From Swiss-Prot:
SMART domains: CLECT. Residues 300-405 form the C-type lectin domain. This is Killer cell lectin-like receptor subfamily G member 2. SUPFAM superfamilies: C-type lectin-like. The keyword Hydrolase does not apply. The gene is KLRG2. It comes from Homo sapiens. The lineage of its organism: Eukaryota, Metazoa, Chordata, Craniata, Vertebrata. Residues 72-81 have a biased composition (Pro residues).
């Protein structure tokens, strides 16, 4: 009180100053809901005030929450703090004591450690005092008590502290107040919070605490993973039919497209059947061609030849060839096999002499240049034979080897 009197202008020690009523300074039992006031320093030369320490200690014990708490029990006789030293006095920081112990929150056990990954922004209440400017500087009248306005300022997350930097600096999550701007979130962020992830896609503290406490617990949201998986599977499954169907469906319609598809399948089936029949026929012909000549016969171009190892008369040789639907060699046969295979010097051919002269077995006459020699005078020599590649007249009863010739089947 003496210091406040000495600070009055004019240096009058006995002057009486109007003092504020004590009831306005003493916190009553009916005002526990008013947030704590934090006085701003204005002068470095002022001495610390015990009243400011009491107010700061009381403010530190209150939780910055939007919910109202019941008044704390107080003794029967309230303690009257000393009079205020005036506006602009810097309060001294209070000493550590029972009043600075942090009270447990609702639903939290005393002494529980904060959960990991729980650093979240909070709201500060700033005490703004407006001082009128109309008061004279040299007046002895004390300035009126400034009006007080409380503003809620949203404080974002500090960039100096990471969410997972140090568990010692992590705070508990608090529910945002109704008037705060931090509580206004988008529906997407609210959905992520309900599903167990925060706005950045990390796991909530309840889920993250299940992992190792030393490592950062960060996971992808299940909803985001399912959405990405569905987005990857939809084009593969062809569920977006309007984009994946062929252009023919858009132009002709689905019924016509299905009908044309049926016709295409039927045409392909018929084509496969015809191809199979053609392959079977060609294979059968190839097998028959390989067996055109009987066993023991030789294939030469389009004729089959049989070279006998025995000797018989001309008539017996012709009878053997007729049994295999063949004949003794004719002119066309002779020119073919004589050029390819060696023929015995003395083998029968299919030429003989009748009443009309020399002719082949098929009744074709012999050309004049092929007529046998020395056959005109001897009437018993009426059968043709080969000797050294030349057609000669021989006795029909003389045994000779023979050659049978026939066309391919």
């Amino acid at each position: 009180m003496e210091e406040s009197w000495e600070a009055a202008p004019g240096g009058q020690a006995g002057a009486e100053l109007p003092m504020e009523p004590v009831g306005s300074l003493v916190p009553t039992l009916e005002q526990p809901q008013v947030p704590a006031k934090v006085r701003q320093p204005e002068g470095p030369e002022s001495s610390p005030s015990p009243a400011g320490a009491v107010e700061k200690a009381a403010g530190a014990g209150l939780e910055p929450s939007s919910k109202k708490k019941p008044p704390s029990p107080r003794p029967g006789s309230p303690r009257v703090p000393p009079l205020s030293l005036g506006y602009g006095v810097c309060p001294e920081p209070p000493s550590p004591g029972p009043a600075l112990v942090k009270l447990p929150r609702n639903g939290e056990a005393p002494g529980a450690e904060p959960a990991p990954s729980a650093w979240a922004p909070m709201e500060l209440q700033v005490d703004v005092r407006v001082k009128p400017v109309g008061a004279a500087g040299g007046s002895s009248t004390p300035s009126p008590r400034p009006s007080t306005r409380f503003l809620k300022v949203p404080v974002p997350e500090s960039p100096a502290f990471s969410r997972h930097a140090d568990p010692a600096h992590q705070l508990l999550l608090r529910a945002p107040s109704q008037g705060g701007t931090w509580g206004r979130r988008s529906p997407l962020a609210a959905a992520r919070t309900e599903s167990g992830c925060d706005a950045e896609g990390r796991a909530s503290p309840a889920e993250g605490s299940a992992g190792s406490p030393g490592s950062p617990t960060c996971c992808r949201c299940k909803e985001l993973g399912l959405e990405k998986e569905d987005a990857a599977l939809l084009p593969r499954a062809g569920l977006d039919g309007d984009e994946k169907l062929p252009r023919a469906v858009t132009l002709t319609g689905l019924p016509m497209y299905v009908k044309s598809l049926y016709w295409a399948l039927a045409f392909m089936a018929v084509l496969l059947a015809v191809s199979g029949v053609v392959i079977v026929v060609l294979a059968s012909r190839a097998g028959a061609r390989c067996q055109q000549c009987p066993p023991g016969w030789v294939l030469s171009e389009e004729h089959c030849y049989y070279f006998s190892a025995e000797a018989q008369a001309w008539e017996a040789s012709q009878a053997f060839c007729s049994a295999y639907h063949a004949t003794l060699p004719l002119l066309s046969h002779t020119q073919d096999f004589l050029g390819r295979y060696p023929v015995s010097r003395h083998s029968w051919v299919g030429a003989w002499r009748g009443p009309q002269g020399w002719h082949w077995i098929d009744e074709a006459p012999l050309p004049p240049q092929l007529l046998p020699e020395d056959g005109e005078d001897n009437l018993d020599i009426n059968c043709g034979a080969l000797e050294e590649g030349t057609l000669v007249a021989a006795n029909c009863s003389t045994p000779r080897p023979w050659v049978c010739a026939k066309g391919t089947q």
